[in-house]
Amino acid sequence: MAEGRGAGTGYASLTALGLAPGALALAIGAAFVAAFVRGLAGFGMAILLVPLLGLMVLPVEAVIVSNLLGLLIGLSSLRQTWEAADRSSALTIGGLAMIATPFGLGLLHAIDPAWARVLIALVAVLAFVLVLLPPRPDGHSPHRAEVAATGISAGLLTGFAGMPGPPVVPFYLRQAIPAARARASMLLVFLATSLASSVAGLAMGMAGARHALLAAVLFGPIWLGNRLGGMAFGRVSDRLWRWLVALLLAASGTVALVRLIP
């Protein structure tokens, strides 16, 4: 009887998630890989996770779950991130992004999905082009307009696509700062955008118990993948890390362009 009750409970859990066992296994695998990339590169979890989850749940739900997972994993390593980040720029960019995120969520509901894919593709390609530009000279201090544009666009993209990375990554990658500081600064910004999008989703009635349950189920592989990715980051040089980040941006741009093909 106990075994039967256990099987019934497991079935009920899958029913609550709305996923078949095979789909859930795929989601767990995707979460692990996406989190490993995040731990190594400092970003990329949403870029990989949202499209894959979008095959199993509605695109809006994939964005919501990805944002919830970004919040949970960001809080789990907040102390290390806070100590290593360039807090002056990260807090400004993160604050502006939090303000802009609800407007991105509004756009997600208002714009035609076909146009949404075009805009996301353009942003992803532009981010890769910016990374290829020459790095800033030593001692360069970003202009206020550059900081503001980075924060606002990151917030809009967080709400719109769950992808704050395209404007934030080039901003830090082109700065003459160590890879560890750039990575931590990006992670601090992404924690802010995850918090804003999660709160906005709840306030707008877009996030519910099902999304929280799916995020809770996926958090285990997310934590493990992020931990292993962070360990791998400690074994690569600054130069190699920057190339890996550029390649990840190129891959995201390619995927976004492929999705435009009918």
Regions found by a protein language model. Name each.
Residues L228-L249:
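Interfacial loop-to-transmembrane junctions
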